[in-house]
UniProtKB/Swiss-Prot annotation:
Protein's pathway: Amine and polyamine degradation; putrescine degradation; 4-aminobutanoate from 4-aminobutanal: step 1/1; Amino-acid degradation
Lineage: superkingdom: Bacteria
Record SUPFAM superfamilies: ALDH-like
Record's protein name: Gamma-aminobutyraldehyde dehydrogenase
InterPro entries for this protein: Ald_DH/histidinol_DH, Ald_DH_C, Ald_DH_CS_GLU, Ald_DH_N, Aldehyde_DH_dom, Aminobutyraldehyde_DH, PatD
Pfam families named among the record's database cross-references: Aldedh
Classification of source organism: Bacteria, Pseudomonadati, Pseudomonadota, Gammaproteobacteria, Enterobacterales
Oxidoreductase among keywords: yes
Reactions accelerated catalytically: 4-aminobutanal + NAD(+) + H2O = 4-aminobutanoate + NADH + 2 H(+); 5-aminopentanal + NAD(+) + H2O = 5-aminopentanoate + NADH + 2 H(+)
Positions of the catalytic residues: E246, C280 (nucleophile)
Miscellaneous remark of the record: 4-aminobutanal can spontaneously cyclize to 1-pyrroline, and 5-aminopentanal to 1-piperideine.
Family listed: Belongs to the aldehyde dehydrogenase family. Gamma-aminobutyraldehyde dehydrogenase subfamily.
Length: 474
């Protein structure tokens, strides 16, 4: 397994403390990797800053060609990436290969095209004898922090728009699941000029803080927890860096009496538990109108009970383990606290799986109330709650009564109601009669404590640029 850092076009061993990397399906240590030292963090940022002088002036065509080559290499090595993601993250191998790798490849190909479509405005004369124009230019060095749940996918979401816009990047993957990012570094080093992409390894305190606080870094992009986002915003405030934050969610799933119950059950079974629920858009907070509440709970409980947890390399496995022992304990604690309320009923699951690995049973909880922690706080595991509601006004207020604002869905056959409710929901994305579906052409990002800034789409590309005015006297 590739375990070296990429700094200024060279693969080098870390000079810091060694950290274990685990296989969550067994609990065994896969390998130990040395963190980047403070000097190596500085070297990576300075290499990116030096490379920006030339990379930032390349044509969109040149940048697009590099991104397309990287997409091709990822596709050619899809099985290798899927196996690494499966072993390090615990994902079912077939899901990583069939679902994630094609989407990752598509992100790079989309931004290769988008790079050639990004324009400033050629405006006109707003002062006699002077012509104004608007430019969209790259910022410089971007520090990107990728999370442990979709390491390679999130690395793609950050690298592709930043590079397409002409920036240089220093990427720090989560120390829990770094292997696909380190493999990507190995393959990317021969495609991009030295220093354009740098990949480090290490914990937040030892590597993340010196990276994000470095004076040469112009922007920090994070996908992670609210706590990590707060820390980075505070840490970077003295240097007034631009920040791009995607900080999790607690997606409301609003099911009206007229909804297609079979479609809801199928959708939540898939989109509430994909990646063992370790997804910021997971369909985890169901509000069911009272007319269909009992039926939905019964049918959904039966469906969730059929989900198969197992070894990631088993083709029949639908749910793998959670990412770490610490996270398993967090999920277990959240469910135990829900059970202790007395009014929340465990329909299925509600316990750790016996044996090796960090497995938690797919869980459905019914009877949750609006103020319950299981409704208000992100669990980030295979846990879905169901809360009954009376009417449209009540459920919209409840759905919006959350610190999160990333994703939501509405299930109804009434087109007018779908439009009406969608317009009032305070979430970056609202799906109607589906959930979880993302495409490269559309923006992904939240509001409230879920953060700001967009991933994917032309909006995502613009986030990695600075708007400049140039005036010419003639």
């Amino acid at each position: 397994m590739q375990h070296k850092l990429l700094i200024n076009g060279e693969l080098v061993s870390g000079e810091g403390e060694k950290q274990p990397v685990y296989n969550p399906a067994t609990g065994d240590v896969l390998l130990e990797i040395a963190e980047a030292s403070a000097e190596q963090v500085d070297a990576a940022v300075r290499a990116a800053d030096a490379a920006f002088a030339e990379w930032g002036q390349t044509t969109p065509k040149v940048r697009a060609e590099c991104l397309l080559k990287l997409a091709d290499v990822i596709e050619e090595n899809g099985q290798v990436f899927a196996e690494l993601e499966s072993r390090n993250c615990g994902k079912p191998l077939h899901s990583a290969f069939n679902d994630e790798i094609p989407a990752i490849v598509d992100v790079f190909r989309f931004f290769a095209g988008a790079a050639r479509c990004l324009n400033g405005l050629a405006v006109g004369e707003y002062l006699e004898g002077h012509t104004s124009m608007i430019r969209r230019d790259p910022l410089g060095v971007v520090a990107s922090i990728a999370p442990w749940n979709y390491l390679l996918m999130m690395a793609a979401w950050k690298l592709a728009p930043a590079l397409a816009a002409g920036n240089c990047v220093v990427l720090k993957p989560s120390e829990i699941t770094p292997l696909t990012a380190l493999k990507l570094a190995e393959l990317a080093k021969d495609i991009f000029p030295a220093g354009v992409i740098n990949v480090l390894f290490g914990r937040g305190k030892t590597v993340g803080d010196p990276l994000t606080g470095h004076p040469k870094v112009r922007m920090v992009s994070l996908t992670g927890s609210i706590a990590t986002g707060e820390h980075i915003i505070s840490h970077t405030a003295p240097s007034i860096k631009r920040t791009h934050m995607e900080l999790g969610g607690k997606a409301p799933v609003i099911v009206f009496d007229d909804a297609n119950i079979e479609a809801v059950v199928e959708g939540v079974r898939t989109f509430g538990y994909y990646n063992a629920g370790q997804d910021c858009t997971a369909a985890c907070r169901i509000y069911a109108q009272k007319g269909i509440y009992d039926t939905l709970v019964e049918k959904l409980g039966a469906a969730v009970a059929t989900l198969k947890s197992g070894a990631p390399d088993d083709e029949s496995t639908e749910l793998g383990p959670l990412s770490s022992l610490a996270h398993l304990e967090r999920v277990s604690k959240a469910v135990e606290e829900a059970k202790a309320t007395g009014h929340i009923k465990v329909i299925t699951g509600g316990e750790k799986r016996k044996g090796n690995g960090y497995y938690y049973a797919p869980t459905l909880l019914a009877g949750a109330l609006q103020d319950d922690a299981i409704v208000q706080k992100e669990v980030f595991g295979p846990v879905v709650s169901v809360t009954p509601f009376d009417n449209e006004e009540q459920v919209v207020n409840w759905a919006n009564d959350s610190q999160y604002g990333l994703a939501s869905s509405v299930w109804t056959k009434d087109v007018g109601r779908a439009h009406r409710v969608s317009a009032r929901l305070q979430y970056g994305c609202t799906w109607v009669n589906t959930h979880f579906i993302l495409v490269s052409e559309m923006p992904h990002g939240g509001q409230k404590l879920s953060g700001y800034g967009k991933d994917m789409s032309l909006y995502g590309l613009e986030d990695y640029t600075v708007v400049r005015h140039v005036m010419v006297k003639h």
